[in-house]
Curated annotation (Swiss-Prot):
It holds the Pfam family ThiG. GO terms for biological process: thiamine diphosphate biosynthetic process. It comes from Bacteroides fragilis (strain ATCC 25285 / DSM 2151 / CCUG 4856 / JCM 11019 / LMG 10263 / NCTC 9343 / Onslow / VPI 2553 / EN-2). The lineage of its organism: Bacteria, Pseudomonadati, Bacteroidota, Bacteroidia, Bacteroidales. One of its GO terms (cellular component) is cytoplasm. Catalyzes the rearrangement of 1-deoxy-D-xylulose 5-phosphate (DXP) to produce the thiazole phosphate moiety of thiamine. Sulfur is provided by the thiocarboxylate moiety of the carrier protein ThiS. In vitro, sulfur can be provided by H(2)S. The gene is thiG. 1-deoxy-D-xylulose 5-phosphate binds at residues 158, 184-185, 206-207. This is Thiazole synthase. It catalyses: [ThiS sulfur-carrier protein]-C-terminal-Gly-aminoethanethioate + 2-iminoacetate + 1-deoxy-D-xylulose 5-phosphate = [ThiS sulfur-carrier protein]-C-terminal Gly-Gly + 2-[(2R,5Z)-2-carboxy-4-methylthiazol-5(2H)-ylidene]ethyl phosphate + 2 H2O + H(+). Gene3D superfamilies: Aldolase class I.
């Protein structure tokens, strides 16, 4: 499996993990390690910025993991830039998952403010990974603005409904000159495998692992699914038949006359 490269950094794993909704920090840490991930997102609002010994961070920080603070909770570009600067100071990284969703019910990203914030943050030296609508035009604009990746949603956050935006994701992947990370809505390992088979660069998963009966085993399942999907994509999937006419894999029938 080819390595994933984002902003010059190589990643062996193409599975990114979120850290919300776990029943305990211990379950979270063990799930992170079981998944093999090298990219972990953490919402700034969940971290005690005043404490240098926040218990949650102790379970996330590992030498092989790129910490990716996110701006979940901000409502516009101005708030996002402010939050990003706080995150850079607190976490010592210029990597940022940009999330702007002013509607607290559906948590859908604001496309206008996301593009505006991306332009500003890139100028300030941030490595910006924006969570966005599965809009091919917007994703191309974010790429042109300097985003390190685009992170279009598969379905609304936390719904576990899979790739509801599949047709748009296919266009985004086809047109992209930067990695495409499918984010939000992935509820089963099969969803992740499907995204990777389409050519997605990576998947970000949180809820499906965190609320599973056994998060550690589910993390392992997602690891295997992402690897299988990516390997299948790199190997070259066979074309699907048109219509419903079967085609035998062993069509020779001469032996019947022997």
């Amino acid at each position: 499996m080819e390595k994933l490269i984002i902003a010059g950094r190589e990643f062996n794993s193409r599975l990114f993990l979120g850290t919300g909704k776990f029943s305990s920090n211990e379950w979270m840490e063990q799930s992170i390690l079981a998944s093999g991930t090298e990219m972990v997102t953490v919402a700034m609002k969940r971290v005690d910025m005043e404490s240098t010994e926040d218990d949650m961070l102790k379970h996330i920080v590992h030498p092989h993991i790129q910490l990716l603070p996110n701006t979940s909770g901000v409502r516009n570009a101005e708030e996002a830039v402010f939050a990003a600067q706080m995150a850079r100071e607190a976490f010592g990284t210029n990597w940022l998952k940009l999330e702007i969703h002013p509607d607290p019910r559906y948590l859908l990203p604001d496309s206008v403010e996301t593009l505006k914030a991306t332009e500003e943050l890139v100028k300030l030296g941030f490595v910006v990974l924006p969570y966005c609508q599965a809009d091919p035009v917007l994703c191309k604009q974010l790429e042109e603005a300097g985003a390190a990746t685009v992170m279009p949603l598969g379905a609304p956050i936390g719904t576990n409904k899979g790739l509801q935006t599949k047709e748009f994701l296919q266009i985004i992947i086809e047109q992209a000159g930067i990695p495409v990370v499918v984010d939000a809505g992935i509820g089963a390992p099969s969803h992740a495998a499907e995204a990777m088979e389409m050519g997605a660069s990576a998947c970000l998963v949180n809820t499906a692992i965190a609320v599973a009966g056994n998060p550690i085993e589910m993390a392992k399942a997602f690891k295997q699914a992402v690897e299988a999907g990516r390997t299948a994509y790199e190997a070259g999937l066979g074309m699907q038949a048109i219509g419903f006419v079967a085609e035998a894999s062993s069509p020779l029938t001469a032996f019947l006359n022997e």
